[in-house]
């Protein structure tokens, strides 16, 4: 066992040869390197698989022995200061290693086919392998200096991948936005690291925690300064994990390739912030109010992310806000002191979200055969629908990921989210109400995404919904070039599902329309589609290749079974809670005297309540977004609510207000754009004006005045001595007269 730990230092460096060899190959042998480009995908998967096997071995030893291993190399600069570099293997490290490698391998296999026709194929795999190296180095770091170095490398890789298609202005701006937003958090992290080094004199985690606890117990620290340093450390995690108010970069990060979205949202960049808080939790729990601040940021992010996901049209943006909300749950759990629940949800969410993103990538890949390569069209759920019979495997996988995120048993996220929700009651009833309500919102918007994508009919084949033109509402070329705009610029997504033939908005209609041979006749008691008299033959999406489906099927298995790792049952000598063994010893401020086990009755009582809330959210989603030829088409209960009146008008205003809030991202981006971006530009313009007109203007003005005075004097002189003597005596006389009159006035006064 000791020998296995001794060689753990090699873990971050195993994927590193791939980007190095790709770079050298493109520099020295560009033609051969490009012709053998598929070989690099195999090498990337192979090296990361070796890391995964090594990590599994370490994890098994962690579960059996609960040991912690640290190895440090010291570089002594002088007698007073030395730099120490090493690696730390503990339960948190082993969990993150398994997570990074398993998700990373699935994404790499998926990317081989997804990126096969992209000219940046080699660049993509170089970035991906370096991304894995950076994240593996981050989680094995033994001190804050190493954390910061690999933290920045993770950020660099994410910026490169977000702006992978840098020739697209939108992608370039998204990259810049991610960079600038994370600069704020990273600067705070650096200041926090320096602050705690100034307090304790150490960067090593063990020494830092021990020295700081001694200082706290002896009351030898300034609590205001300590709290400020802790908040600065936490700011780094806030930016990296897209917590409010530094969350604005995450939805725009969807401009990168879909496999990158899966990796960033599941196991790398956004997980880094959660990892940092979990690693520093022994430091945070002894600082007054910082834990409350962490939980406050978490609960705000939980609710904000869910509300912003309600009306997104882009499938990847909807999933991005879902990630933001789920990361808020993890941050809430850490702030409550429920360390096990936070890491449990990090694991289950990673596999479920990777499944959803790879499933969405499969959908986008299939839609590109219809709309061409144009993310605004291939990712737009307005143009989707009816994909169930065309991509059945993708549909099934996406449904399982959706149900998992909704919290439906026995899927993965049910077990972890239920644990966080139950712990929230012990922490704060207000936080618990918000967290439970958001669980219902999660079920609603995830079911909405599923219904709009897979159920109903393929909207891309229908004509202009406004009834004014006989052209498709998207004029789509094969290569996704700009076509005609949507006829109604401000139309809402639900409007497409509730327009009557005459163009008037209505929720309810009993008319029967025959659409075409591919869509059967339908009666629409609720959300109705306008009548399209189109009988043309269209092409349809097809299922993705096996190379893309294989990782999706593996992630289905993880989504089905990974939740059983943390089942908190321990009865009759049978302990099923593998996760608790893995995390021994762990921190839990809410269950200090508990062995992390509950009885069957308490479990079922809590589970029924959480599943009921999720089911209610799913029902509301079906109520609003159900397919137009669903089995509920004759449900007259819905039509009983049709009557228009003041209440209906008021409810529509509320609904439209919620839609505007969600679709406009809570106006937070607009606020930043107005008050920060524009404000900084105005300040820069004022500084430029002050520098040019005031700072430079004063000496320039003196020089200019001196120049003109000199010119005047020069014009007076003609080169004659008599003229010089005349002016000299004149000036002296004037001076003497002034002096005389001043003395006279002084004597008189």
Curated annotation (Swiss-Prot):
It is an enzyme of class 7 (translocase). The keyword Oxidoreductase does not apply. It is a multi-pass membrane protein. InterPro entries: NADH_UbQ_OxRdtase_chlpt_su5_C, NADHpl_OxRdtase_5_subgr, ND/Mrp_TM, NU5C-like, Proton_antipo_N. It is found in: Plastid, Chloroplast thylakoid membrane. It comes from the Eukaryota. GO terms for molecular function: NADH dehydrogenase (ubiquinone) activity; quinone binding. NDH is composed of at least 16 different subunits, 5 of which are encoded in the nucleus. NDH shuttles electrons from NAD(P)H:plastoquinone, via FMN and iron-sulfur (Fe-S) centers, to quinones in the photosynthetic chain and possibly in a chloroplast respiratory chain. The immediate electron acceptor for the enzyme in this species is believed to be plastoquinone. Couples the redox reaction to proton translocation, and thus conserves the redox energy in a proton gradient. This is NAD(P)H-quinone oxidoreductase subunit 5, chloroplastic.
